C-alpha cells in the first residue's frame, strides 16, 4: 500500500540513493500530520452510518431523476447499491487517512471506477455531489478539530478530483 513513506523509500531505493533532505522533510511533515489524520479517521468510523446516509440522501435530493424508470436508482435495490458504494469510498478515505497517503483510494477505489460507472449507467457526478455535500457539512469543532477537518476534506477533494 502506498504512503508518503513507502513512496519515498521505493523511489530512492530504485535510484540507488539515500533519501534527500527534502524527501525526509516530506516524510516528517506526513508524520506530524498523522495525529490529525487519525482523529479524522476515528470520527468517520464512529459516525460512518450517518455520514453515508446524509451523503446518499444529498445525492438523490440533487439528482431526483435518478429514481425514475430506467435510471441508476429506479429500484430500492439500486438505491441500496448507491449507498453501499458511498460507504465503500468512505472506508477507502478512512484507510487513506490512517496510512497517510492515497494508496487505498488509488489501488482499490479509483482504478476502473469510471469504466464501471459508465457501463452501469451510473453518473459519477452523483457520487461527486455526495462527497461534496460531506465536505461542505464538516463543522469545526462539532465534528473534529480544524487540522483533522483539513485532512478529511483533502481526502474527499482527492476523490472528487479524479472523477
Curated annotation (Swiss-Prot):
Q: Which organism is it from?
A: Aglaothamnion neglectum (Red alga)
Annotated coiled-coil segments of the chain = none
Q: What is this protein called?
A: R-phycoerythrin alpha chain
Q: Which domain of life is it from?
A: Eukaryota
This protein's assembly is summarised as:
Heterodimer of an alpha and a beta chain.
Tell me the lineage of the source organism.
Answer: Eukaryota, Rhodophyta, Florideophyceae, Rhodymeniophycidae, Ceramiales
Do you know which InterPro entries this protein is assigned to? Globin-like_sf, Phycobilisome_asu/bsu, Phycobilisome_asu/bsu_sf
| Cellular location(s) | Plastid, Chloroplast thylakoid membrane
Biological processes per GO annotation: photosynthesis
Amino acid at each position: 500500500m502506498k504512503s508518503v513513506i513507502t513512496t519515498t523509500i521505493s523511489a530512492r531505493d530504485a535510484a540507488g540513493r539515500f533519501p534527500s533532505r527534502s524527501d525526509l522533510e516530506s516524510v516528517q511533515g506526513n508524520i506530524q500530520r498523522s495525529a490529525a489524520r487519525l482523529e479524522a479517521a476515528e470520527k468517520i468510523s464512529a459516525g460512518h452510518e450517518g455520514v453515508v446516509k446524509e451523503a446518499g440522501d444529498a445525492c438523490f435530493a440533487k439528482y431526483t431523476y435518478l429514481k425514475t424508470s430506467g435510471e441508476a436508482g429506479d429500484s430500492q435495490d439500486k438505491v441500496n447499491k448507491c449507498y453501499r458504494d458511498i460507504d465503500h469510498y468512505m472506508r477507502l478515505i478512512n484507510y487513506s487517512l490512517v496510512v497517510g497517503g492515497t494508496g487505498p483510494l488509488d489501488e482499490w477505489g479509483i482504478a476502473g471506477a469510471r469504466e464501471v460507472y459508465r457501463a452501469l449507467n451510473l453518473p459519477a457526478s452523483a457520487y461527486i455531489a455526495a462527497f461534496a455535500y460531506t465536505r461542505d457539512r464538516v463543522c469545526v469543532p462539532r465534528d473534529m478539530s480544524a487540522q483533522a477537518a483539513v485532512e478529511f476534506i483533502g481526502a474527499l477533494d482527492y476523490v472528487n478530483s479524479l472523477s
